Each structure stands twice: as C-alpha cells, then as structure tokens.
C-alpha cells in the first residue's frame, strides 16, 4: 500500500518525505498560489483554477481569495457553497461539504493529525481523518474544525468569545 492509500485508509503515512505525496501537495500549492494572485474581478479565471484544484464540485460556488488547501482532490463541495477570505483546508483525508454551506473568514478544516510517538512524529508520520459538513450550515469566523469531525445539517458553528 503506498503512502497516499495509507492516508485515505486512516493509517499513519509519510506526509513529509514520500515523493508522490510531496509532489501532489506542491502541485496544489502552485494552483492555490495562481488562484490567490488573480484580480478579484477576474472571476472566470478564478473559477477555472478552482475547478483544477477541487476534486468534486456539485454546483454553484464562490471561493474568496486567499484560499489554501493541501491536495484539493479530497475536497467535495455541494451546491451554493461560499467561503470568505483565508479558508484553509488540510485535506489529507476527505472533506465533504453539503449544499448551502457558508464559511466566514479565517476558518480552518484540518484532517491532519500527528503521531503520538515522538519517533514516528520525527519520521514525518501523520494520520488523516475525514471531515463532513452537512447541508444548510453556517460556520462563523475563526473556527477550527479538527480531524474526524462531522457537522450536522441545519446547524451553525462559531468560536466562543
């Protein structure tokens, strides 16, 4: 089983030194950079680039720069998806968004977890657990969604003050 398949299966995998994993992450970083350098008025070019990044797009979407993700191929967005500035998605595992999802600025979705054992951590081993966001969800500013979390439909998530 290669490192990418280990990640998708929820096993510890080499996220830092495996050539294929690093190349895929670098390719996505280049596309995110290209997207983030677009003029805000060039929505056509932005949409073209996002369609190269995101694994599955099921309908209308707005993604406001800057936007960052690790691979993009593990991300599915439903219809009527909106994310404000500075959304970060660490998608070592699947990140699935339902329909009518609205995301405020500075939100992080992180499927990435690190090995508990210091020796494994020093080898660059990580684990990735999927994140699911249901339909009709609003996620407020500065929220961090951690590995393995599911957010139910018709809900709101916000950072307490």
Q: What positions do the PLM features span?
A:
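Terminal amphipathic alpha-helical/low-complexity segments used for targeting or macromolecular assembly
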Residues: 1-59
């Amino acid at each position: 089983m290669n490192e990418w398949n280990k990640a998708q299966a929820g096993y510890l995998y080499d996220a830092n030194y495996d050539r294929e994993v690093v190349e895929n992450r670098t390719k996505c970083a280049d596309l995110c950079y290209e997207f983030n350098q677009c003029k805000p008025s060039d929505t056509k070019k932005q949409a073209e680039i996002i369609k190269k990044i995101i694994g599955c797009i099921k309908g209308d979407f707005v993604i406001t720069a800057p936007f960052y993700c690790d691979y993009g191929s593990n991300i599915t967005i439903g219809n009527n998806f909106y994310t404000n500035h500075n959304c970060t998605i660490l998608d070592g595992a699947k990140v699935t968004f339902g329909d009518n999802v609205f995301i405020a600025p500075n939100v992080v979705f992180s499927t990435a977890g690190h090995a508990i054992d210091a020796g494994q951590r020093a080898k660059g081993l990580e684990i990735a657990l999927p994140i699911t966001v249901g339909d009709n969800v609003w996620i407020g500013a500065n929220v961090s969604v951690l590995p393995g979390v599911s957010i139910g439909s018709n809900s709101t998530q916000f950072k307490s003050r």
